[in-house]
Structure formats: structure tokens, C-alpha cells
Amino acid sequence: MNSIYIDIELSKTGLKIPKFKSGKLIHSKYDPEREAINLVNNIDENSFYLVTGIGAGFFIKKLLEKYPDSKIVAIENSQDDIDFLEEHFNIISELKNKNVIITTTENLYDSLLQNYIPSIYPSFKLIEYR
């Protein structure tokens, strides 16, 4: 497996969070759910979101709660990264929703062609999560 993630750590609130090979964490070490809520509260409503970095899915779940009718394409660097997140966080089943598409950078072009229809989703927002 050639993932950008190497391990998991527990946050101060007891939640598992992925750790990059660099040693950095993708989420807050203290309260990743609070971090996700704060980030979502600073995002205006759009009909289509492209989110780079899935992590444990805290941010995407909160974004879905706030904007349930929006379409979200969530990107990870590789299938190995998605496999790591699925193994440790059940990310595919956790984010199972008709409005969420999980993809890799390699498949991003096709995912956007299949899912982004400007007449249906007139506003588009890129969110670089970490």
C-alpha cells in the first residue's frame, strides 16, 4: 500500500484521526468535530462542492448536515488513500449518500464530467481541506 497516510491517532476528544507520513494530522488533534463545525459555518451555501482531502469524514458529514441538497465530490490522492480511510474509518459507508461521490485525483475528470451539470448545480465551490 502506498498511501499518504501512515497511521491513526486519537484526538483529545477520543476520536480517531488519520496521520500523514509527514507526521502531521489532517484534523485538529484537540476536537476534530468542533473544527469541522467551525469550517462549515464559514462556508456559504453552494450547490456543488469539490473537497480535496476526506480524512475521517468529519468535515464532509457536517457540510452534508448544513447543506443536505448539495452535491459533494470528495477527492483523495489515490485509491490506496481511500482504502486506508475505509479500513480505519469505514469512510465509504459513513459517507454513503446519493449526493457524495468519493474519487481519486486520477478519476477526478471523469467524476466531474458525470456529476457536475451547471444547469442543475449553478454554483461551484472548491474547498481545500488541509
Specify the residue positions occupied by each region the protein language model found:
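N-terminal donor/sugar-recognition subdomains of glycan-related enzymes
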Residues: 1-130
